[in-house]
From Swiss-Prot:
Names of required cofactors: [4Fe-4S] cluster; pyridoxal 5'-phosphate
Keyword terms, alphabetized: 4Fe-4S, Iron, Iron-sulfur, Isomerase, Metal-binding, Pyridoxal phosphate, S-adenosyl-L-methionine
CDD domains xref list: Radical_SAM
Name of protein: L-lysine 2,3-aminomutase
Radical SAM core domain residues: 106-329
Length: 342
């Protein structure tokens, strides 16, 4: 049985207070988990110079004490492998660093991504935007206004995607302002929010935010970013229940990560945990080839084999679509599972 860390974090603590009390030092993180730093772990600490370590205590509380290979820990702990310069890996794997206006990416025909905030509650070591120039694409009302003018001038945009960073790092009053502006643009029908905050700090789903979503004329979708069943807890389930009650469509996308979820049984457990929380598995992405994350790479052939096995373990509606994102392409690219044809 896993031994879970106790951090004395009040279940009802304000999300901003939790956000201000994240762990940023690898030594403190290992100490909380009662893990002795060996030579390899010590060598990895310098990787925070490449990309800062940042982990909420509520997320640490779901990690197993004494286990340096805990799948949640592996997603956030600095590693010496981040210094490896691997062929084909770059600082801009999706060719995103040239936005049409500051903070707005018009990547797809009918959809645009608004980078609402540059920061995240948790820094995931595999993040494809770990090198993104957020300083040039700051989330503030001035840049948002320019982006909204662009959206209003492009009637083909019927869906806006709030991304980041993490868009739910914006405070409720900021999200209220953005929603109000989007609701005034008649051709915008849907708002899709991609966020990891509801899983790492479930208290982010405030009653005020839920009520604002309930009032909106827009169809609102929340795409959670969850990679392992151990991330899902009761607090997350309660947050999702509140959102379901007001009609928010709940989806999840994962990244296939070596040493975290690279087997069918683990993915089946994740699909079951998500479905129990009212969240539909949506996409399983192969790793974006971002510099510093090559040690998480799972090959396409391995990914196909894992997915073929997953199909035998869960119902079809609980199987996410295996896909990769290719810079410059007009949509995500599904990976053919190479199933036998009758």
């Amino acid at each position: 049985m896993a031994h879970i860390v106790t951090l004395n974090t009040p279940l009802r603590e304000d999300w901003l207070a939790q956000l201000a009390d994240v762990v940023t030092n690898p030594d403190e993180l290992l100490h909380l988990l009662q893990i002795e730093a060996d030579e390899n772990l010590r060598a990895g600490q310098d990787a925070r110079r490449l990309f800062a370590l940042r982990v909420p205590r509520a997320f640490i509380a779901r990690m197993e004490k004494g286990n340096p290979d805990d799948p949640l820990l592996r997603q956030v702990l600095t590693s010496r492998d981040e210094f490896i310069v691997a062929p084909g890996f770059s600082t801009d794997p999706l060719e995103e660093q040239h936005s049409v206006v500051p903070g707005l990416l018009h990547k797809y025909q009918n959809r645009a991504l608004l980078l609402v905030k540059g920061g995240c509650a948790v820094n995931c070591r595999y993040c494809f935007r770990r090198h993104f120039p957020y300083a040039e694409n700051q989330g503030n009302k001035r840049n948002w206004t320019v982006a909204l003018e662009y959206i209003a001038a492009h009637p083909e945009l019927d869906e806006i995607i709030f991304s980041g960073g993490d868009p739910l790092m914006a405070k409720d009053h900021e999200l209220d302002w953005l929603l109000t502006q989007l609701e005034a643009i008649k051709h915008v029908k849907r708002l899709r929010i991609h966020s990891r905050l509801p899983i790492v700090i479930p208290a982010r789903i405030t009653d005020e935010l839920v009520a604002r979503f309930d009032q909106s004329r827009l169809q609102i979708l929340l795409v959670n970013h969850i990679n392992h069943a151990n991330e899902v807890d009761e607090a997350f389930g309660l947050a999702m229940k509140k959102l379901r009650h007001v009609g928010v469509t709940l989806l999840n996308q994962s990244v296939l990560l070596r040493g975290v979820n690279d087997n069918a049984r683990t993915l089946a457990n994740l699909s079951n945990a998500l479905f129990d929380a009212g969240v539909m598995p949506y996409y399983l992405h192969v790793l974006d080839k971002v510099q510093g994350a090559a040690h998480f790479m799972v090959t396409d052939d391995e990914a196909r084999q894992i997915m073929r096995e997953l199909l035998t373990l869960v119902s079809g509606y609980m199987v996410p679509r295996l896909a990769r994102e290719i810079g410059g392409e007009p949509s995500k690219t599904p990976l053919d599972l190479q199933l036998r044809q009758c």
